[in-house]
C-alpha cells in the first residue's frame, strides 16, 4: 500500500519545496523504494499553460501532453520515473470536477461545500495521482502543496491532507515542513521566530510536522536547531538544516547526511536498503572539476526571470557534466538587440534561441540567428527558435524577403510559418484548432515519434528515430519547403502523418553547426544521462572556441 509524505512551506514562497521533495525522492529511490511525486497547485487556473512565464516560470510538458508546473521538471531530473498528467493538479481542476459532478446530479441534492466535497475531491486526485506510475504500486508518494501555510488558497489542500492523515492507517502518512530561518546582518545571528510562527500556524490547522527543513543561507548551528525543536515541538534530530549551495544536486547528500531518509523510513515503517548516492557524488564532482569552459548566448524575451527557461538551463548544465565543461550562460534580451544591434553577440562560443510566444522581440532573435549563420557560430533553435531560423533563412538566403509567421503577421504575403488547423495527437486522435480556438490546451502537446533522415546531423545525434515532447501551435509551412530546400536548407525529420518539419539544419558546406528543432528536448534531459542534442551543441561550441583560438594565434604570428 502506498504511503504519503506531504511537503508544505512556510514564511515565504520560493524556498525550494520542489527541490526538497525531489531530493527526498532521490534518496528513497536509491534505497530501493518505488517513489512518485505530485504537485498540488492552489491557483484557480486549470493548468499553467496560459500563464505568463514572467509570473509562473516555465511550463513543463509531460510525456502524455500535460502542461504542468516546473517542479515536475525537477521531479523527472531527480528520479527515474516519468511524470504523468495526474501528477499535477490545480484548484481549477478540482472545482471543475466538483461542479461537473454537481451538474450531473452526483451529490443527490446536497449543498456542495468546501468541506467535505472539495477536500474529498482533492484526496481522490491525490490517490489517483499516486497510482499514475509504477503500475499503481508506488511505495511512497511525495505530495508537494504549493504556496505557504496561511495562504487562503492553500487551506483546502492542507485540510485535505489533514483528513487523509486521519483516514489512513498509522505510519502511512508524514509531513515535511520547509521554512525560512533568516540571517539578520545587523544582529549577526539567525532568527528562528519566523519558523516558530510558521509551525504554530500549521498546528492550528491540525497538522504536526514530522520533519522541519530549515532553509538558511548558512548551516544552522546545533543550538539553533535545539531552540527550533523546543519551541516547535519537533524532535531535534528532525530539525534539518538546509543551506545555500552552488548546485541543487548537492541537496540529496545534504539531507541524507543529516538522516532525513532514516526519519521518514521510521515514521512510515518502511523497510529499505542503505542509500547509495554515488551517482550524485559523481555528478557533483564533475561539475566542480571541468576540463573546459564555454559561454552560450541565450537570446530570449523572458530573460529577466530565468525560471522561464528552467529545464533548458539545467539541460545545458547536464551537457556540461557529460562533456566535462563548465557552461556559462549569457542571457540576452532580444529587444536589446533590436535597439542596440548585435555587438553583444561577439565572443560567444554558441547561440541558442529558445521557445516563446508572441511577436515582441522576434526581430531581435532573427538578427541573432542571422549573426550566427553568417559568422559560423554554432546555433541551436528550439521551437520558436527553429521557426525563426527558417524565417531568417527564407528572407536572406531563399529570396523570400517578406517571409514571416502568421503568429506575428496574420496577413503575411509569405507565411513560411503558419497555424496548422488539423493534426493527429499522440494517441492517433484528430485534433482541430483555429484562430478562434481557446488558448488553453489547443497546441500540439506531448511526445511524438518521428523518423530521422539518414546522412544528416540529426541522424548522427539521434539515430534513426526521435521521440521528443512538443508544445506549439504554429508549424513550418510545407508550401515553402521546396524553395527552402533548393536554397540549401535540410529538413532532417518530419512527422509521420502530416509530414510537418520537425528538425532543420544547414549542410556543413554552408555552416559547421546550425540546427533547429520544433520540439522541446530540454524536457527529457537528466543529470544522470544528459541529452545527445545538448551534448552535441556544447561539443560544437568547444570546437568553435578552438577554431577561434587557433585563428587568433595565427594572426598573432603574422
Curated annotation (Swiss-Prot):
Molecular functions per Gene Ontology: ATP binding; CTP synthase activity; glutaminase activity; identical protein binding; metal ion binding
Where in the sequence is the signal peptide annotated?
none
The yes or no answer to whether the keyword Magnesium is present is yes
| Superkingdom field | Bacteria
Listed under catalytic activity are:
UTP + L-glutamine + ATP + H2O = CTP + L-glutamate + ADP + phosphate + 2 H(+); L-glutamine + H2O = L-glutamate + NH4(+); UTP + NH4(+) + ATP = CTP + ADP + phosphate + 2 H(+)
Residue positions binding ATP: 14-19, 71
Name the catalytic site residues: 383, 520, 522
The region called Amidoligase domain is annotated at 1-270
Q: Name one Pfam family in it.
A: GATase
CC annotations in GO: cytosol
Please give the start and end residues of each transmembrane region: none
Q: Where does UTP bind?
A: 13, 191-196, 227
Record key words, sorted: ATP-binding, Glutamine amidotransferase, Ligase, Magnesium, Metal-binding, Nucleotide-binding, Pyrimidine biosynthesis
- Quaternary structure per UniProt? Homotetramer.
- Extract the NCBIfam families matched here: PRK05380.1 (NF003792), PyrG (TIGR00337)
The role this protein plays is: Catalyzes the ATP-dependent amination of UTP to CTP with either L-glutamine or ammonia as the source of nitrogen. Regulates intracellular CTP levels through interactions with the four ribonucleotide triphosphates.
What's the miscellaneous note? CTPSs have evolved a hybrid strategy for distinguishing between UTP and CTP. The overlapping regions of the product feedback inhibitory and substrate sites recognize a common feature in both compounds, the triphosphate moiety. To differentiate isosteric substrate and product pyrimidine rings, an additional pocket far from the expected kinase/ligase catalytic site, specifically recognizes the cytosine and ribose portions of the product inhibitor.
Q: What is this protein called?
A: CTP synthase
Amino acid at each position: 500500500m502506498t504511503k504519503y509524505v506531504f511537503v508544505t512551506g512556510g514564511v515565504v514562497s520560493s524556498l525550494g519545496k520542489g527541490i526538497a521533495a525531489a531530493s527526498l525522492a532521490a534518496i528513497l529511490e536509491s534505497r530501493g523504494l518505488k517513489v512518485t511525486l505530485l504537485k498540488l497547485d492552489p491557483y484557480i487556473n486549470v493548468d499553467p499553460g496560459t500563464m505568463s512565464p514572467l509570473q509562473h516560470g516555465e511550463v513543463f510538458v509531460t510525456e502524455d501532453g500535460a502542461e504542468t508546473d516546473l517542479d515536475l521538471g525537477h521531479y523527472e531530473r531527480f528520479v527515474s520515473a516519468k511524470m504523468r498528467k495526474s501528477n499535477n493538479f490545480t484548484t481549477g481542476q478540482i472545482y471543475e470536477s466538483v461542479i461537473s459532478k454537481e451538474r450531473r446530479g452526483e451529490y443527490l441534492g446536497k449543498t456542495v461545500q468546501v468541506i467535505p466535497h472539495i477536500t474529498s475531491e482533492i484526496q481522490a486526485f491525490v490517490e489517483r495521482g499516486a497510482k499514475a506510475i509504477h503500475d499503481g504500486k508506488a511505495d511512497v508518494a511525495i505530495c508537494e502543496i504549493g504556496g505557504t501555510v496561511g495562504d487562503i488558497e492553500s487551506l483546502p489542500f492542507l485540510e485535505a491532507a489533514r483528513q487523509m492523515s486521519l483516514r489512513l492507517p498509522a505510519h502511512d502518512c508524514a509531513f515535511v515542513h520547509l521554512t525560512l530561518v533568516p540571517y539578520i546582518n545587523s544582529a549577526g545571528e539567525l532568527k528562528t521566530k519566523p519558523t516558530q510562527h510558521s509551525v504554530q500556524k500549521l498546528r492550528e490547522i491540525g497538522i504536526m510536522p514530522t520533519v522541519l527543513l530549515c532553509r538558511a543561507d548558512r548551516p544552522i548551528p546545533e543550538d539553533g536547531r535545539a531552540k527550533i525543536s523546543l519551541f516547535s515541538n519537533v524532535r531535534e534530530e528532525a530539525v534539518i538544516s538546509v543551506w545555500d549551495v552552488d548546485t541543487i544536486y548537492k541537496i540529496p547528500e545534504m539531507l541524507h547526511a543529516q538522516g532525513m531518509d532514516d526519519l521518514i523510513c521510521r515514521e512510515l515503517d518502511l523497510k529499505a536498503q542503505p542509500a547509495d548516492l554515488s551517482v550524485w557524488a559523481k555528478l557533483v564532482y564533475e561539475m566542480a572539476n571541468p576540463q573546459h569552459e564555454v559561454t552560450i548566448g541565450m537570446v530570449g524575451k523572458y530573460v529577466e526571470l530565468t525560471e522561464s527557461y528552467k529545464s533548458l538551463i539545467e539541460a545545458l548544465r547536464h551537457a556540461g557534466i557529460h562533456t566535462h565543461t563548465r557552461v556559462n550562460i549569457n542571457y540576452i534580451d532580444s529587444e536589446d538587440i533590436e535597439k542596440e544591434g548585435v555587438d553583444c553577440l561577439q565572443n560567444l562560443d554558441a547561440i541558442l534561441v529558445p521557445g516563446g510566444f508572441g511577436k515582441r522581440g522576434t526581430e531581435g532573435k532573427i538578427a541573432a540567428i542571422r549573426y550566427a549563420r553568417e559568422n559560423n557560430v554554432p546555433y541551436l533553435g528550439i521551437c520558436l527558435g527553429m521557426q525563426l531560423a527558417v524565417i531568417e533563412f527564407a528572407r536572406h538566403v531563399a529570396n523570400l524577403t517578406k517571409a514571416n509567421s502568421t503568429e506575428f503577421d496574420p496577413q503575411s504575403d509569405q507565411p513560411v510559418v503558419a497555424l496548422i488547423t488539423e493534426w493527429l495527437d499522440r494517441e492517433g486522435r484528430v485534433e482541430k484548432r483555429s484562430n478562434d480556438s481557446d488558448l488553453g490546451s489547443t497546441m500540439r502537446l506531448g511526445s511524438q515519434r518521428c523518423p530521422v533522415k539518414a546522412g544528416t546531423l540529426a541522424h548522427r545525434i539521434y539515430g534513426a528515430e526521435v521521440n521528443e515532447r512538443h508544445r506549439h501551435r504554429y508549424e513550418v509551412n510545407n508550401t515553402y519547403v521546396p524553395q527552402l530546400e533548393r536554397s540549401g536548407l535540410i529538413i532532417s525529420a518530419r512527422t509521420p502523418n502530416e509530414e510537418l518539419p520537425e528538425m532543420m539544419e544547414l549542410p556543413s558546406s554552408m555552416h559547421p553547426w546550425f540546427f533547429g528543432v520544433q520540439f522541446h528536448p530540454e524536457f527529457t534531459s537528466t543529470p544522470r544521462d544528459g541529452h545527445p542534442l545538448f551534448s552535441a551543441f556544447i561539443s560544437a561550441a568547444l570546437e568553435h572556441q578552438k577554431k577561434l583560438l587557433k585563428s587568433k594565434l595565427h594572426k598573432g604570428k603574422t
